[in-house]
Amino acid sequence: MALRVTADVWLARPWQCLHRTRALGTTATLAPKTLQPFEAIPQYSRNKWLKMIQILREQGQENLHLEMHQVFRELGPIFRHSVGKTQIVSVMLPEDAEKLHQVESMLPRRMHLEPWVAHRELRGLRRGVFLLNGPEWRLNRLRLNRNVLSPKAVQKFVPMVDMVARDFLETLKEKVLQNARGSLTMDVQQSLFNYTIEASNFALFGERLGLLGHDLSPGSLKFIHALHSMFKSTSQLLFLPKSLTRWTSTRVWKEHFDAWDVISEYANRCIWKVHQELRLGSSQTYSGIVAELISQGSLPLDAIKANSMELTAGSVDTTAIPLVMTLFELARNPDVQKALRQESLAAEASIAANPQKAMSDLPLLRAALKETLRLYPVGGFLERILSSDLVLQNYHVPAGTLVLLYLYSMGRNPAVFPRPERYMPQRWLERKRSFQHLAFGFGVRQCLGRRLAEVEMMLLLHHILKTFQVETLRQEDVQMAYRFVLMPSSSPVLTFRPVS
């Protein structure tokens, strides 16, 4: 059985403990039949001062996904609330995601991620596409798409990712052979975290970091610590106004800026090295995304650096966590794992000859990743600032309103996904599911690193499944915590046993 939340959730209003929160059912309030004004949208009101105290005390908002899930159960598929002067409308149905996409302009707007923006402003650095809006965003994005998202770009970096995935497999084999029991039981999360850094760095900068071995360099350890620290501090600062946290969270702000400084210095060094190699003409073959961007000269170096920082930071947890949760669910669902192994073994010859075949010859594995991201959406929610008026659930929503689309609640709605508590990859192969797989966003602002993440996950899972049986003694659900990304509050322990 997949996720069935059993954690106690403390809501800001009312302050009550909710036991055994269930998936959102079909008992939600139906949308009105005639068009209603914005003010008629069900309102979620909470005491903002009590909420601030709660966030300060808990150093974040780890149960955000559960809190919002319960509000949908109480108020229906749409509700509104305000944060300061900002009006926010929250939705969770695929039909509303489709409407958001239909009215999307050429310049879709997102809200600012204040902790990240504050670092760029303080250090005088440019912003990448994750932090930009308007014409500058579009200019950067169109030039990046060609080298990061396009099929031609994917074809170029797939062999690099496959090399790292195969090295991970060999390292895992070595550890298993060293164990007298002929198997290996471990918390795999940090190893997968290192894999995603290694693979992303190789695809971006054409450089291996050596993170799959036993002895990591001090520089590598510093970089890994900076990535962890950046995400942790982001979640601690995200839900409170800067005017407050500058006094209450000075240590956290320092940790946040220090972490970004390490990431910035790392990106600087990598880009300088790539630039020097290009000037010397030492590389005549494809050597990564950044080398292509510099060679084309369509973006200035500081813009390449800004986007490299964001791709580096954004391609780690968002890939490692789905890998962890997929392996855990396959360990709990051995029949699904067996079917995936048969698929991988049948496709091994074609994938060995051309690693890109993994993206087309493993449909059940692709479905398994969709099922993992249905249950454990790393981002938790998508957001758009409306550029024009829109009708959602027969309520008028004016232009300029911030709309949040909660993927966690969509994935647990039995009206959308029958038996949502079950891990059933086959559901994605039975029929087309429009606007139901949104873990990477939608439209022209979908995740820039989507294809890189998919390649990293597909290739590694293929190599693991054809070689190892993955097992776990744990049958209960893993509790998730919102720490800027949705991640396991404690990582599951898995056993890797060679396939006989």
Swiss-Prot record:
One of its GO terms (cellular component) is mitochondrion. Keywords: Heme, Iron, Membrane, Metal-binding, Mitochondrion, Mitochondrion inner membrane, Monooxygenase, Oxidoreductase, Steroidogenesis, Transit peptide. It is found in: Mitochondrion inner membrane. Residues 1-24 form a transit peptide. It is an enzyme of class 1 (oxidoreductase). Its cofactor is heme. It catalyses: a steroid + 2 reduced [adrenodoxin] + O2 + 2 H(+) = an 11beta-hydroxysteroid + 2 oxidized [adrenodoxin] + H2O; 21-hydroxyprogesterone + 2 reduced [adrenodoxin] + O2 + 2 H(+) = corticosterone + 2 oxidized [adrenodoxin] + H2O; corticosterone + 2 reduced [adrenodoxin] + O2 + 2 H(+) = 18-hydroxycorticosterone + 2 oxidized [adrenodoxin] + H2O; 18-hydroxycorticosterone + 2 reduced [adrenodoxin] + O2 + 2 H(+) = aldosterone + 2 oxidized [adrenodoxin] + 2 H2O. The keyword Transit peptide applies. This is Cytochrome P450 11B2, mitochondrial. It comes from Mus musculus. The lineage of its organism: Eukaryota, Metazoa, Chordata, Craniata, Vertebrata.
